[in-house]
Amino acid sequence: MSKLSRKSILDEDEDVEEILPKTRGDERSTWVSSSSFVSSSLIFCKCVVTVVELDVGVALLGIVGRVVPLYTVTLLEPEFLNLGGELSWCSMTNFCELFFYFFSFFFSKKRPNIDSK
């Protein structure tokens, strides 16, 4: 009799094991597919953000490499600032020149000639 009861308990356990893995498998496959979609979209967003950061970083390096030396040269000119510390008209023209060089750097393939004065 103990063998019979043991067998019936084992049969019940097998039935439970047959039902549970299917349920767990379905839930798990849904979870895996949704998590893989989320992770792939996050990876895509991270790649886009990284590319944008690289573009902005390269652009900033280009600006710093081109504009800062020119700006320091114009700061060393004696007529750039008046004695009150306010910007003079000459400094505004130098400021406009900075923007001209900045835009010509991005819209032309060769470097603008800074020493043309």
Swiss-Prot record:
It is a multi-pass membrane protein. It comes from the Eukaryota. The keyword Membrane applies. The keyword Transmembrane helix applies. It is found in: Membrane. The chain crosses the membrane at residues 32-52, 56-76, 87-107. Keywords: Membrane, Transmembrane, Transmembrane helix. One of its GO terms (cellular component) is membrane. Disulfide bonds: none annotated. Partially overlaps YOL036W. This is Putative uncharacterized protein YOL037C. It comes from Saccharomyces cerevisiae (strain ATCC 204508 / S288c) (Baker's yeast). The lineage of its organism: Eukaryota, Fungi, Dikarya, Ascomycota, Saccharomycotina.
